[in-house]
């Protein structure tokens, strides 16, 4: 707060200094991409600064008791409901470290780092330490690569069988991002444990590896492979994957500037400047990747914001299952930190597009310019579109919140992805998805 006030008071001096620098600068190189717009002195402070996380359900007219009951019903069904049709959380015995449990992608028949990290984030937000620890124990036991000679060393296999046998040993970086942030939040909520339950130490080890791990060439189930770190140092951007063949690409839904701001406050001091800049880069990336009319982003992208049609999946240039989460990511960033007003306009643009498609009829898959590609209406997209209301400021925003409220808790064959996004959206829209930070955390300025 002090730094912000100091900045506001010295605006005139800063402008003079910048003008002088501009007048003396010569031999400039190519123009850099437009920087994230600076927040004005009258811009609203984010929820992390104020402690007031928006309760969109209250704005839409729902009583707090109803909201809390709805969240608990969803949690109990998805974590402790009927295992044949409702649950995605499965207890799996115990080992020397304690109970084990996994989040099951029922439709695909595997366990994914994405879902495991989502499960941990949900658990820490709801103060469910037992479930958090059991998921983390399973992930470290069955998914973490601890062989220094393996290209995935220091990361988690993104897909394994329910018995822990890897399907793909390489990581999907969004899993690591959610693991790290959930571990930091756990350290703040519950304090430090021992061994693998020393949450802060575990988070910092992972955070160091995703940024600093050196290239490793070695054998995998798919043959010899070379893999690097999960963040490109030059682009300051999360990679699609660390294997060299695809490391120069990204995935819009892996961009989590709200989390990078957390890391810039509680992570290793030497890397905090990098994470602050990574947050700025991701905000600029969203502004470039979002279609100018629809605000839809592709599943996979190039570092310059253009879509990437992966050779094995050319439809990745469209708005598909991964891309549902992009608006959720930039809207949470606005809600928590309120540093980029472009996010308000992008959420307004996105919701205007879906409203025009028909609130009850919009599909799940589109070209970036808005041509429907089918998929029907799914709870997962309804959920992420509701979270976009954290940034949107048009009155239509509450229609998307009410649409989420009317959705039943996902069950059946597709309950994993829909269910995880649904429960996280309930937490976001109720003000119960929070950044758990120590009071003395660096303010990031």
Regions found by a protein language model. Name each.
Residues 363-445:
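C-terminal functional modules
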Residues 181-192, 253-258:
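Hydrophobic alpha-helical segments with transmembrane-like composition
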Residues 21-22:
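C-terminal motif of bacterial Sec signal peptides marking the signal peptidase cleavage site
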Residues 48-176, 182, 192, 347, ...:
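N-terminal carbohydrate-binding/catalytic regions of secreted carbohydrate-active enzymes
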Residues 2-13:
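Bacterial N-terminal signal peptides that target proteins for export
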Residues 136, 183, 200, 207, ...:
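Inward-facing hydrophobic residues that define packing positions of alpha-helical scaffold repeats
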Residues 43-73, 77, 84-87, 109-113, ...:
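Extended ligand-binding clefts on enzyme/binding-domain cores
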Residues 29-44:
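Ser/Thr-rich, Proline-interspersed low-complexity disordered segments
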């Amino acid at each position: 707060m002090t730094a912000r006030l100091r900045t506001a008071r010295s605006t005139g001096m800063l402008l003079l200094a910048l003008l002088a620098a501009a007048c003396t600068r010569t031999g400039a190189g190519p123009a850099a991409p437009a920087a994230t717009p600076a927040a004005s002195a009258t811009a609203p402070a984010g929820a992390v600064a104020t402690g007031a996380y928006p309760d969109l359900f209250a704005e839409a007219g729902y009583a707090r008791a109803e909201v809390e009951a709805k969240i608990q019903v969803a949690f109990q069904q998805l974590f402790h409901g009927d295992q044949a049709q409702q649950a995605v959380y499965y207890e799996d015995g115990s080992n020397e470290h304690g109970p084990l449990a996994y989040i099951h992608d029922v439709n695909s028949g595997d366990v994914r780092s994405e879902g495991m990290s989502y499960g941990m984030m949900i658990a820490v937000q709801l103060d469910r330490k037992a479930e958090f620890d059991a998921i983390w124990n399973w992930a470290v036991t069955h998914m973490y690569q601890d062989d220094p000679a393996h290209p995935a060393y220091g990361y988690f296999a993104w897909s394994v069988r329910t018995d822990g046998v890897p399907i793909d040993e390489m990581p999907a970086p969004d899993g690591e991002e959610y693991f790290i942030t959930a571990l930091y939040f756990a350290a703040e909520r519950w304090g430090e444990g021992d061994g693998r339950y020393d949450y802060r130490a575990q988070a910092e080890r992972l955070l160091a590896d995703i940024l600093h791990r050196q290239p490793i060439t070695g054998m995998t189930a798919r043959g010899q492979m070379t893999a690097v770190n999960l963040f490109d140092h030059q682009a300051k951007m999360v990679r699609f994957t660390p294997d060299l063949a695809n490391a120069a690409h990204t995935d819009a839904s892996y961009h989590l500037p709200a989390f990078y701001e957390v890391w810039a406050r509680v992570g290793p001091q030497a890397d905090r400047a990098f994470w602050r800049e990574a947050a700025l880069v991701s905000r600029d990336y969203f502004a470039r990747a979002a279609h100018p009319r629809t605000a839809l982003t592709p599943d996979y992208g190039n570092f310059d914001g253009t879509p990437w049609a992966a050779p094995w999946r050319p439809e990745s240039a469209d708005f598909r299952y991964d891309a549902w989460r992009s608006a959720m990511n930039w809207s949470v960033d606005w809600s928590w930190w309120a540093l980029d007003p472009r996010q308000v306009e992008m959420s307004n643009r996105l919701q205007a597009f879906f409203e025009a498609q028909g609130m009850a009829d919009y599909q799940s898959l589109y070209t970036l310019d808005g041509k429907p590609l089918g998929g029907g209406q799914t709870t997962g997209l309804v959920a992420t579109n509701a979270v976009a209301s954290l940034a949107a400021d048009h009155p239509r925003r509450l229609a998307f919140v009410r649409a989420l409220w009317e959705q039943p808790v996902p069950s059946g064959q597709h309950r994993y992805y829909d269910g995880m996004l649904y429960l996280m959206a309930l937490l976001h829209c109720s003000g119960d998805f929070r950044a758990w930070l120590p009071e003395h955390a660096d303010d990031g300025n």
